[in-house]
Amino acid sequence: MSNLLRDFEVEAKNPSLEARQRWRSSVSIVKNRTRRFRNIRDLDKLADYENKKHQIQEKIRVAFFVQKAALHFIDAAARPEYKLTDEVKKAGFSIEADELASMVRKNDTKSLAQKGGVEELAKKVSVSLSEGIRSSEVPIREKIFGENRYTEKPARSFLMFVWEALHDITLIILMVCAVVSIGVGVATEGFPRGMYDGTGILLSILLVVMVTAISDYKQSLQFRDLDREKKKIIVQVTRDGSRQEISIHDLVVGDVVHLSIGDQVPADGIFISGYNLEIDESSLSGESEPSHVNKEKPFLLSGTKVQNGSAKMLVTTVGMRTEWGKLMETLVDGGEDETPLQVKLNGVATIIGKIGLSFAVLTFVVLCIRFVLDKATSGSFTNWSSEDALTLLDYFAISVTIIVVAVPEGLPLAVTLSLAFAMKKLMSDRALVRHLAACETMGSSTCICTDKTGTLTTNHMVVNKVWICDKVQERQEGSKESFELELSEEVQSTLLQGIFQNTGSEVVKDKDGNTQILGSPTERAILEFGLLLGGDFNTQRKEHKILKIEPFNSDKKKMSVLIALPGGGARAFCKGASEIVLKMCENVVDSNGESVPLTEERITSISDIIEGFASEALRTLCLVYKDLDEAPSGELPDGGYTMVAVVGIKDPVRPGVREAVQTCQAAGITVRMVTGDNISTAKAIAKECGIYTEGGLAIEGSEFRDLSPHEMRAIIPKIQVMARSLPLDKHTLVSNLRKIGEVVAVTGDGTNDAPALHEADIGLAMGIAGTEVAKENADVIIMDDNFKTIVNVARWGRAVYINIQKFVQFQLTVNVVALIINFVSACITGSAPLTAVQLLWVNMIMDTLGALALATEPPNEGLMKRAPIARTASFITKTMWRNIAGQSVYQLIVLGILNFAGKSLLKLDGPDSTAVLNTVIFNSFVFCQVFNEINSREIEKINVFKGMFNSWVFTWVMTVTVVFQVIIVEFLGAFASTVPLSWQHWLLSILIGSLNMIVAVILKCVPVESRHHHDGYDLLPSGPSSSNSA
């Protein structure tokens, strides 16, 4: 089978165009190409989109480079005139939406200057730059300037899915056969008896189409809901005089937006104020170099990314008036990138389809030959009647229906169904799967490289200890939870200046007047510490003018700010990783509050304090300052600072993380912590989580960086903790792990984590702490930033794989039995025991209902007690082939005995004996599939009933199948070619079906694999990680 599937191999992430085209062209037997490829990306549309995108980028590039220069030579009078409408005037605005859009799109700084700059423009859109808009104004602003939403492709109606299901070529042929059958039947047998056979086929087709359409429609609704979740972005704005968070879709013209590193610019706008703002415009213009935005170059375009710095912007254009909106409009709903399992099952379906087509043709040929020979031997070869035509038509319908059953169209579609179900469940469990393949690949992950802060820990940080003036003070757990620090007025003032000036966060009042701190958890902890010391954020910010800000980034691991002092000169404050900032200091504030030189003895003493804090699992930060005669023109100095304080921030480990790590280890998944924290803090937290164990290695990023490639490969399997790491270190670790055959999942939250997220097999971005850049490069977004959620994604990834294996085992058994029983019977008796209507019903049990029952089963406990699914493992395992062969042989023997000796065994005689026998065969065949569907719940384990009632879908499908079978046999005989059965015959059919359970138990006792695993799972990996988990 592996050799036959050579053309059906694709990479899980970023598959090559050649591989994608190769497997598409290899799919030769398809009943309904429209439906089969509905969820698969259309390569022609993709190429069309890329061309349109390129055209828009070229247009924007012209605006950036040509129009900027041209505008200097254009007379103001030559610019288009925008007449103010009465509606705009009545709403209180004095500028048109199109004029705002044109100014930003053309980078028209001259027009902005003529209007008086951003301050005067704010007045034209009736907004205060300090207070923001009022929430009550949002509806009128949306009416005048538009909503911040992009044109979406209309949702497909249910009737569209019905129409799509009708495109099945075999169903179309059957419909033609049914219509002809009705015509010929009425002519020969009269009305209404002559209509029964054809009408039965038409009703069966209608049922198949409706069930298929309902299943596909529900799937499409799930994907649409998930797509909406992907587009949700939260932005920070100033409204009603306070800073607050809103959805990107609620943004309106006039909003004052706060931007920081990693944010996506949510609309077109104009720079108000900020520091070192660098914008990545490659998504729009294709330019790789970042653009510096300031008061001289003030225009910001929607869809671009903040690469560095921070700023406030005034929103001027939203929705479809922006260039980003126009680009989004060109996006086509071309489906998802195909997953490896979908491609592989397309291959399996193609191979089986070819076999089925051959059997169908042979069956028709054999039936026709037998019919002609019978006519020849009876001497009526020259006399042909309409009844003979009806018989031949019936043979043709049976042959076509064999193709319906034999071409397992449901195999690749079952993967989509299972993934959609898993994605919906994961969404409710706080994980948003952005790419289908990620859920599937997560089932094969052998290693998770996880951040510490917020993922393993709660991210609810508080300053627990502080060293200042040679004293260590601990937080007092009292009614006010305050620190009792005895500081001189000068030291306290300097400390509070450093806390409140050197921050990217804000202290605001909410609508109820309560104090609220907006910003990262670390910033919130330090600001809360400042408030506990009696500081006032707003007073401090008003006292000093900020001259320059160098925002925190994960490379420098520090943040700095420069403020102007009232008496002249300037003061630089810096805070950051203790070891790094300590090296920048020349002085320290001693016990008397005086600044004294930082001797080697004092450095050792402070280092011991830092180490002591870190060993208690506290994150440590140093707060330092430096006075300057004048503001430097370039970057702030990296030396000559005075140490003020070391703070220890407590960030408790999340409840359940240790158990989640143990679950991973039991499942053969190695967990590695990669953090920017001090190595002592990292080791303490890793031990608490169960990650750092005896025999494991904890290493600093700088040490790892200096290793040769050979040395790296030698120690990487032992690494459990990497501390003080840079984003580049994480990328290098991930890259090397993949080279040694690991399937790597990696978490990230910062902009600089994007390369590692992109490099990993599965990129996991944090939904709360993660930047938009990180989320855009991720495959899965962990909405609650919780490590337990990551483990849940792995659990569902494995469930998808094993569920599809169950479905494939079930479907192939039905394929084999249906094909052989009809073919052999046609060869020997000249008739097929299963009619077209019956085969259509079996096809629905097998395809749509079977997929619903088996492909949507929730994960069981045993899934995380096995090793990861090996990428190279054969999808259809020896164990599955054993089960398929054993069940097929049993069913063929029993049904064959009934077919050839049933009348004598069941003592059937009379005119309806053949009809009764064929009904018993049909009934027994269906109940064989019902019980085999239950068997398929477990490929290897004997107890197939465990957890069966936990899956309501499975229970519902079983109930519906049995109820419909009773209706078909007892009440729809005229259409389904059945007759009502006695209770003895019903009991016999159920008994024959239930014996499948005993056959399954016997089969599962037959060993077929020498290894101690099943179902495509590999042995637990050897090495330090597995031994530790043991």
Curated annotation (Swiss-Prot):
It is a multi-pass membrane protein. Mg(2+) binds at residues 749, 753. Keywords: ATP-binding, Calcium, Calcium transport, Calmodulin-binding, Ion transport, Magnesium, Membrane, Metal-binding, Nucleotide-binding, Phosphoprotein, Translocase, Transmembrane, Transmembrane helix, Transport, Vacuole. GO terms for molecular function: ATP binding; ATP hydrolysis activity; calmodulin binding; metal ion binding; P-type calcium transporter activity. SMART domains: Cation_ATPase_N. Pfam families: CaATP_NAI (PF12515), Cation_ATPase (PF13246), Cation_ATPase_C (PF00689), Cation_ATPase_N (PF00690), E1-E2_ATPase (PF00122), Hydrolase (PF00702). The active site is at 451 (4-aspartylphosphate intermediate). Activated by calmodulin. Residues 1-157, 218-345, 414-804, 856-875, 933-950, 1005-1030 are cytoplasmic. Residues 19-30 are annotated as: Interaction with calmodulin. It catalyses: Ca(2+)(in) + ATP + H2O = Ca(2+)(out) + ADP + phosphate + H(+). It is found in: Vacuole membrane. GO terms for biological process: defense response to bacterium; monoatomic anion homeostasis; negative regulation of programmed cell death; response to nematode. Residues 179-196, 366-395, 824-834, 899-910, 973-982 are lumenal. The modification Phosphoserine is found at residue 28. Coiled coil: none annotated. The chain crosses the membrane at residues 158-178, 197-217, 346-365, 396-413, 805-823, 835-855, 876-898, 911-932, 951-972, 983-1004. Gene3D superfamilies: 1.20.5.170, Calcium-transporting ATPase, cytoplasmic domain N, Calcium-transporting ATPase, cytoplasmic transduction domain A, Calcium-transporting ATPase, transmembrane domain, HAD superfamily/HAD-like. SUPFAM superfamilies: Calcium ATPase, transduction domain A, Calcium ATPase, transmembrane domain M, HAD-like, Metal cation-transporting ATPase, ATP-binding domain N. GO terms for cellular component: chloroplast; cytosol; plant-type vacuole; plant-type vacuole membrane; vacuolar membrane; vacuole. The N-terminus contains an autoinhibitory calmodulin-binding domain, which binds calmodulin in a calcium-dependent fashion. Belongs to the cation transport ATPase (P-type) (TC 3.A.3) family. Type IIB subfamily. NCBIfam families: ATPase-IIB_Ca (TIGR01517), ATPase_P-type (TIGR01494). This magnesium-dependent enzyme catalyzes the hydrolysis of ATP coupled with the translocation of calcium from the cytosol into small vacuoles. This is Calcium-transporting ATPase 4, plasma membrane-type.
